[in-house]
Amino acid sequence: MNIYDQLQAVEDRYEELGELLSDPDVVSDTKRFMELSREEASTRETVTAYREYKQVIQNISDAEEMIKDASGDAELEEMAKEELKESKAAKEEYEERLKILLLPKDPNDDKNIILEIRGAAGGDEAALFAGDLLTMYQKYAETQGWRFEVMESSVNGVGGIKEVVAMVSGQSVYSKLKYESGAHRVQRVPVTESQGRVHTSTATVLVMPEVEEVEYEIDQKDLRVDIYHASGAGGQNVNKVATAVRMVHIPTGIKVEMQEERTQQKNRDKAMKIIRARVADHFAQIAQDEQDAERKSTVGTGDRSERIRTYNFPQNRVTDHRIGLTLQKLDTILSGKMDEVIDALVMYDQTQKLEALNK
């Protein structure tokens, strides 16, 4: 099947999906309706581009016909030639774009995410840097019109982040932030350093797609839920009623504690969101590890401990080690203007996938 047959098949399926989503039987089946809605959304950009491409092809045909029929009208012929030139250039651009749009889609790209950031090697300095990363992602989310909600956080004595869990919601969140998982290294002079020496510290980032209950169901028998009194700074109990929730997935040992909300039910709901994402991610990682060759063709190796990026403060430099990208814009990037880095990662990933398909 050539590229045009593939595009026509995508358009035909898109139209079929539109009819299915109007079918009362489909609407009443929540799981199927969600699956078909996602499929329609994932193909919409491709179909729109293909329809625009077909219009460009028609414009080329019309311009060629106009040149033939100009009959000595120099002005009309010149106008038609200009239209032909522009349309041919547009045709080439659309063909390149459509090749990328036809690449196999990551089914999670349109999803919201659970974002986890932890201070790692480097003590207080690592925790402070984890706080810088949190601010960077919060500000980037603002530029994208996304909702950023801190679900759970733990700070240290100097105001750094030991661990933070956040939900980021909006359009195509996972597609842009999925490349952020890994170890982020910082090189700078800590505030407490009297000799002016540069120290190296690390914070880790984990990005997981949000998993709906209809997509991944956890057997309640596999969960142990403990209810306890939420504690504040210094360990004092801050609620007379036990509202904090500790949830453990027994088969994997994955644990979530939630006490940010004032009611037990809200803490339970948030804990369930996180544990569902973590358990699904745990098994997805096992499956990914079994497909080692495929994993190596994507950005990085998929290893969660892989050092993906270095932030060098003295030189105002950010280096992404996976794609060899270096930018002297550390201050700009940490202020949330991450597009240049993320766009480069997306482009690299798409190029790698195109090359793999052409082999």
UniProtKB/Swiss-Prot annotation:
Cited InterPro entries: PCRF, Pep_chain_release_fac_I, Pep_chain_release_fac_I_sf, Prokaryotic/Mito_RF, RF-1
UniProt keyword list: Cytoplasm, Methylation, Protein biosynthesis
Major subcellular location class: cytoplasm
Top-rank taxon, per record: Bacteria
Modification comment: Methylated by PrmC. Methylation increases the termination efficiency of RF1.
Residue ranges of coiled coil: none
Keyword Isomerase: no
Any GO MF annotation of the entry: translation release factor activity, codon specific
Subcellular location field: Cytoplasm
Protein family: Belongs to the prokaryotic/mitochondrial release factor family.
Matching PANTHER family: LD18447P (PTHR43804:SF7)
Protein name (Swiss-Prot/TrEMBL): Peptide chain release factor 1
